[in-house]
Design a protein with these regions (language model features):
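Active-site beta3 strand of CheY-like receiver
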Residues: 41-47
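Alpha4 helix (beta4-alpha4-beta5 surface) of REC/receiver domains from two-component response regulators
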Residues: 15, 59, 82-97, 110
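C-terminal output helix
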Residues: 103-113
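The feature encodes the CheY-like receiver
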Residues: 11, 52-54, 71, 83, ...
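Acidic catalytic/metal-coordinating carboxylates
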Residues: 30-33, 49, 56-62, 94
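Short amphipathic alpha-helix used as the core "switch/output" element in two-component signaling
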Residues: 36, 58-71
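Two-component/phosphorelay signaling modules centered on CheY-like receiver
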Residues: 7-26, 115
């Protein structure tokens, strides 16, 4: 599980919570680091903030989609942006789910488990490592 969040407190909180729930989670603080870690770790899923410095979440989604890495990688977008157009655009780019801030950690965990369960049902899931 890769958590991409530029707010250090929120990022660490999410990673710690996921680890306490038995999931292996790593933190990337921006979109550039996220792309490097996707290639290194081959995560089972990604939690992705949209508004980040250097490379935003939309840019990450576009790159993942352009080269096919989004296939088999469920991405949950987490953002303070409430707009319907942003939600639709994230979905068009391949996001599996969209959670608005603020959110409850239990709600995020439920969504993570849902996308992981959906991913486990896909044949390509067995070809990727779980991180």
């Amino acid at each position: 599980m890769l958590v991409v969040e530029d707010d250090p407190d929120l990022g660490e909180t999410i990673v710690t919570f996921l680890k306490e729930e038995g999931l292996d989670a790593k933190l990337a603080r921006d979109g550039d680091q996220a792309m490097r870690l996707v290639d290194q770790l081959h995560p089972s899923a990604m939690i992705l903030d949209l508004m980040m410095p250097r490379r935003d979440g939309f840019s990450v989604l576009r790159e993942l989609r352009a080269d096919g890495r989004i296939n088999g990688l469920p991405v949950i977008v987490v953002t303070a942006i409430f707009g319907l157009s942003e939600r639709l655009y994230a979905t068009e780019l391949g996001a599996a789910d969209y959670v608005t801030k603020p959110f409850e950690l239990d709600e995020l965990l439920e969504r993570v488990r849902n996308v992981l369960a959906s991913r486990a049902d896909e044949p390509a899931a067995t070809e990727r490592q779980t991180t």
